């Protein structure tokens, strides 16, 4: 068989999605060193896997078990590098600002409100609005 077509493989595995999964798993097994059941003919692993499926020279049950095992395996977590560690929130203030207690914040707010009179507030609002009436 010089060319592998999907029709050749569909006779063995009717579901195209299952065919793709099993062929990919067989190609991975071949790249890990599994024995080839047909002549390679200078073909790459995915083509060899499809040819093996079309010729029914591979155990489909074993392939399904390998596929389930590989899909159920959880990859090892990658260690977080230093830049990522800097972004993870900690007990320290992540913005590098000094922590201000509630009492200090209330005192600062009271000092600001005492310094501004109602005329100052009205002038600030008028300046913010551009001297005109607010739009509705």
Curated annotation (Swiss-Prot):
GO terms for cellular component: DNA-directed RNA polymerase complex. Transmembrane segments: none annotated. SMART domains: RNA_pol_Rpb6. This is DNA-directed RNA polymerase subunit omega. One of its GO terms (molecular function) is DNA binding. SUPFAM superfamilies: RPB6/omega subunit-like. Belongs to the RNA polymerase subunit omega family.
């Amino acid at each position: 068989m010089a060319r592998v077509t999907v029709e050749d493989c569909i006779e063995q595995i009717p579901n195209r999605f299952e065919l793709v999964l099993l062929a990919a798993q067989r190609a991975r097994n071949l790249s890990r060193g599994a024995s080839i059941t047909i002549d390679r003919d200078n073909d790459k692993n995915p083509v060899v896997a499809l040819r093996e499926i079309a010729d029914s020279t591979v155990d489909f049950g074993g392939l399904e078990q390998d596929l389930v095992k590989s899909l159920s395996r959880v990859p090892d977590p990658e260690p977080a590098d230093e830049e990522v560690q800097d972004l993870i929130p900690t007990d320290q203030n992540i913005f590098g600002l000094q922590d201000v207690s509630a009492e200090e914040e209330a005192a600062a707010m009271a000092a600001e409100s005492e310094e501004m009179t109602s005329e100052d507030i009205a002038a600030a609002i008028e300046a913010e609005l551009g001297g005109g009436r607010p739009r509705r």
